[in-house]
């Protein structure tokens, strides 16, 4: 598997020991804004938003030598300026939009950027806390989606399924079994049919 980590600038600033530990892993890091109060939404002016983006990137770069090329906005929310500001700050892809199962490149006024669409319908927060589905239902939904995308991939070319997990939610003792079941299904039972890719290589 190739997990990636969406990390906010405030988290890096507040918990440096955690970032030092994460820097010892091979996982790819994505910028995740400054914090969940600094939402890239509505009438936020471009200067303020640019500051959030650059500050969050610099906060992560203090702890890792890997280039921070990916972005996931807090709440997956963007302003009209977000894509351009991301390109201007050196990001090459974002995961904010939920409109496809295929990656695609688009043009901004600052250059090209790639979208790696997220699957909101399979986000653990969306399924468990908003739709109020059971943990078993969550696992089955992920497995069902994976099976269909494998079938489509064989017939029409590869598909993207990003599984977003939040440790504060699925890391609870009563949910760990569900995570293990999902990973068993994806990594072991269907492992040969899936490219477990880090985002930058897609």
Predicted feature descriptions by range:
Residues 1, 27, 91, 191:
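Short phosphate-binding/catalytic loops that engage adenosine nucleotides
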Residues 2-79, 111, 117-130, 162-167:
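Metal-dependent polysaccharide deacetylase catalytic core of the NodB/CE4 family, i.e.
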Residues 8, 32, 96, 197-199:
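Conserved beta-strand termini and adjacent loop/short-helix elements that scaffold enzyme active sites
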Residues 16-20, 50-57, 83, 146-150, ...:
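Generic structural signal for well-ordered alpha-helices
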Residues 21, 25, 59-63, 85-89, ...:
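Alpha-helical structural signal in soluble globular domains
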Residues 44-51, 133-137, 174-178:
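Alpha-helix N-cap and loop-to-helix initiation/capping positions
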Residues 58-156:
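Active-site-adjacent pocket scaffolds in enzyme catalytic domains
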Residues 93, 143-202:
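C-terminal domain-boundary segment and adjacent tail
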């Amino acid at each position: 598997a190739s997990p990636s980590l969406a990390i906010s600038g405030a988290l890096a600033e507040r918990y440096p020991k955690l970032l030092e530990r994460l820097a010892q892993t091979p996982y790819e890091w994505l910028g995740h804004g400054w914090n969940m109060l600094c939402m890239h939404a509505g009438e936020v002016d471009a200067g303020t938003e640019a500051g959030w983006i650059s500050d969050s990137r610099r906060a992560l770069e203090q702890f890792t030598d890997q280039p921070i090329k990916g972005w996931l906005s807090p709440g997956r929310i963007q302003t009209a300026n977000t894509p351009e500001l991301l390109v201007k700050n050196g990001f090459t892809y974002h995961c904010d939009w939920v409109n496809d199962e295929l990656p695609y490149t688009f043009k901004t006024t600052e250059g090209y950027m790639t979208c790696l669409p997220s699957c909101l319908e399979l986000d653990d927060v969306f399924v468990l806390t908003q739709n109020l589905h059971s943990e078993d239902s969550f696992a089955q939904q992920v497995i069902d989606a994976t099976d269909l995308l494998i079938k489509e991939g064989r017939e029409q070319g590869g598909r993207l399924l990003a599984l977003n997990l939040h440790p504060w939610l699925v890391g609870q003792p009563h949910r760990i079994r569900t995570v293990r079941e999902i990973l068993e299904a994806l990594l072991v039972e269907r492992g040969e049919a899936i490219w477990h890719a880090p985002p930058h290589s897609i």
